[in-house]
Amino acid sequence: MTYHLRVADLPSSDRPREKLLAQGARYLTSAELIAILLGTGQGAGKLSAIGLGQYILQQLGQHQRDPLAVLREITPQELMAIPGIGPAKATTILAAIELGKRVFQSKPTEQTIINDPAVAAAALGSELFWQAQEKFAVLLLDVRHRLIGTQVITIGTATETIAHPRDIFREVIRQGATRVIVAHNHPSGNVEPSPEDLALTQQLLSGAKFLDIPLLDHLILGNGNFRSLRQTTKLWEECPQGD
């Protein structure tokens, strides 16, 4: 595809708006999604809207950076420093980014049934995704796995957080929950469990079994990704919870 061609001159199947309507947004490249927001490119003989979208990503991806990670936190001034991006285009892009954050971080309503790790991760997204400090939180559920509430238990540093089983189960009991999911974030974005994460999970499983409050999962979240330790370890086989 030639990025200097006007979008209107492209075959309809290659035009971002038409492609989105026909195939769905997930099938568009990042440059094509940006092109829809931009509306126009740099003008006749210069970059088209798609070309400008690609150029923005190239500029943000310098020095081996993830361009979308940079775009997530970019300022208006940084965007407008890119040739072809004025106040109108910059504010449109920033508004779309903020709307995306709010949609992603929206919590399930009370009484939502938490029956899947992805639903649990979404319920904790606003507290744990894209955070600069490690946080440890709990999802409090009733016997039918309906959401009672969420609670951040501890806040640590950029590299570690300290959560004691005593503090975790105190909150669970105080809220009257009969099932619990625990979660913490890794600010680095790497959701691989550390030896300390696994050791804490073992302690929590033992405590949950003793208290007859099943621990349904331990999630690790970071930069929009998550890992379910129940699905990826054998810890629940070693200490069944009767849930």
From Swiss-Prot:
GO terms for molecular function: metal ion binding; metallopeptidase activity. The keyword Metal-binding applies. CDD domains: MPN_DUF2466 (cd08071). InterPro entries: MPN, RadC_JAB, UPF0758, UPF0758_CS, UPF0758_N. Gene3D superfamilies: Cytidine Deaminase, domain 2. A motif (JAMM motif) lies at residues 184-197. NCBIfam families: PRK00024.1, radc. This is UPF0758 protein Cyan7425_1778.
